[in-house]
From Swiss-Prot:
Annotated spans, Disordered: 1-84
Pfam families per the UniProt record, alphabetical: AUX_IAA
Protein name, UniProt field: Auxin-responsive protein IAA15
Signal peptide positions on this chain: none
Function of the protein: Aux/IAA proteins are short-lived transcriptional factors that function as repressors of early auxin response genes at low auxin concentrations.
Compartment list: Nucleus
Tissue expression from the record: Highly expressed in flowers. Expressed at low levels in roots and seedlings.
Motif position, EAR-like (transcriptional repression): 25-29
Superkingdom of origin organism: Eukaryota
Any one GO BP annotation for this protein: auxin-activated signaling pathway
Occurrences of domain PB1 (ranges): 107-201
Organism listed in the record: Oryza sativa subsp. japonica (Rice)
Listed PANTHER family: AUXIN-RESPONSIVE PROTEIN IAA15, AUXIN-RESPONSIVE PROTEIN IAA17
Amino acid sequence: MSVETERSSTESSAASGLDFEDTALTLRLPGSSSSSSSSSSSSSSSSPSEPDRKRASATDDDPDNRLGSTATESPPSPKARVVGWPPVRAFRKNALAALAAASSSKAKFVKVAVDGAPYLRKVDLEAYRGYDQLLAALQDKFFSHFTIRKLGNEEMKLVDAVSGNEYVPTYEDKDGDWMLVGDVPWKMFVETCQRLRLMKSSEAVNLAPRSA
């Protein structure tokens, strides 16, 4: 009698479309078995396998890969040009160099020799405005006891007050000729003078001043 009752209940449940597991008395809620099985299958499919995890950890531990990823992700920023004191110092240095070059280009230094003196001196012709200033400078550079004597024909001499010797200021022009100082205009003298010589009057007798 009980066997027939169980068979009839099974047939009725099959006819209604329900399985025996759905109608069985269990501790879980109805329908939880299917959801738990589906979730377990999805988690197993989504979780990586053991070889995949090993490959991923090996890739993370490789320093070359880390450097490559860092280089691709964050390129180095270009260095900004620093503008400050160095350019200012360079500008001042260039300005001073240009000023020094301009001043040196205007200067004209020539050698000065005195008969009987064992040394030479140099004078800047551009620093003077005329023959009087030049002779005064020569007097100060060599012997303080020299005096300047002017003759009637505008010829000038330096006289040694101690020995009484007279010196005639002469110069060598661009052609290599020795001329008397004062025979040409001052600007022409500055342009053509190559060197100066205070020559003794006894040796300068053959030199005659040119007509201006």
